[in-house]
Amino acid sequence: MSLLKMEYNLYAELKKMTCGQPISLFNEDGDFVEVEPGSSFKFLIPKGFYASTSVKTSLVFETLTTTDNKITSINPTNAPKLYPLQRKVVSEVVSNMRKMIELKRPLYITLHLACGFGKTITTCYLMATHGRKTVICVPNKMLIHQWKTQVEAVGLEHKISIDGVSSLLKELKTQSPDVLIVVSRHLTNDAFCKYINKHYDLFILDESHTYNLMNNTAVTRFLAYYPLMMCYFLTATPRPANRIYCNSIINIAKLSDLKKTIYAVDSFFEPYSTDNIRHMVKRLDSPSNKYHIYTEKLLSVDEPRNQLILDTLVEEFKSGTINRILVITKLREHMVLFYKRLLDIFGPEVVFIGDAQNRRTPDMVKSIKDLNRFIFVSTLFYSGTGLDIPSLDSLFICSAVINNMQIEQLLGRVCRETELLDRTVYVFPSTSIKEIKYVIGNFVQRIISLSVDKLGFKQESYRKHQESEPASVPTSSREERVLNRIFNSQNR
């Protein structure tokens, strides 16, 4: 733990790392405040900041020789088998750590690896290689199962705690498992933080992008006051500002054989309105719509658009073009609407809901992994990151207002490597509510652009229904389709 004055060079380095964003740190009084250049306060500079050799320092950090927190249950024959790219990551990590040890730098590394890379199994291999007692911290209970499976495969003694940290502390008085798998809210307990700081050497922060370490959170405080000897941040979409806490990054590109297609399903709608819609439209320009809350609420009650989404999904699913579908909404009521309507069509053997308010949802997710055909309806908050259903082959994005990090994480749900190579994403840029027409079109175009430019998707026009119609279509219908295409091209 290093308390330093905020000199110009230090401030400039921190500012560059956060891409010019405001910097907040703990000061010498323990207050979490925004850092100003030339401040008279001393600030607690996170240990992980010094992991990069580009940061000059005279500080000397402890090495692993000063602790004896070694794994007792390790069996080298249980080490997981890795793909060549995963082995390359391990090689890079080991090489970097040797340099860090030689230079007496903190052993803190961010593994910036694409969705579907296999971060969990790769990290378990590293964990077994290091042979040090480990704490795995996840943002929610949904991620527990995939870690449990891999840790058990390696044969490591472990303990899972997702509820009360007090009961866990009582158990730790009599036993100290080699691996602790916990949810991040456990870090609000100072006694628990002190315990793992003393008895564990490796801290793994899964889905590190879900934490904004420029906020005064439990994870921020833990990394500042109780840092372990070693640390991995795992993410496919790193937050720039989080580098202050883990300032060494390994990023290896992943080549994929997946055939990834994104369809923009357009339609021309007559203007649609209700009393509720007119009431919400009045709030579009108010401060309460700063984060487009009412924009998304309007989408959730846009009946013609909702029907288009349902019609598209039903037709594609019935045709066998897609088989394992994830339907994502922003709002819970929107999720429930789609769930109920799909349930009426396909029944409970096919349609499932990923509801954060249902404690049994994680068990349900496990149960559908091996199904050949299913439709899983959930929210962006619950299933947009970390959802572990590798067999998903298609994604329906029913919302529009999504930031770039969320887009990349969400599309990653259907980019896991399996024997089946086709992956399909459907987005819906049209709306029948004229007041949000251009806003929705722009947001959906951003989803398309990121998927194509960064994630290797190919955009294709969704006109299968029109093209499959008989040639002897009435002239009026053909004219309507032509006008529809012209309208939507102008809209985009």
From Swiss-Prot:
Its EC number is 3.6.4.-. It holds the Pfam family ResIII. Keywords: ATP-binding, DNA-binding, Helicase, Hydrolase, Late protein, Nucleotide-binding, Transcription, Virion. One of its GO terms (cellular component) is virion component. Belongs to the helicase family. Poxviruses subfamily. PANTHER family: ATP-DEPENDENT HELICASE IRC3-RELATED, TYPE I RESTRICTION ENZYME ECOKI R PROTEIN. Interacts with G2. Might be part of a transcription complex composed at least of G2, A18, and H5. This is Transcript termination protein A18. It comes from Cowpox virus (strain Brighton Red).
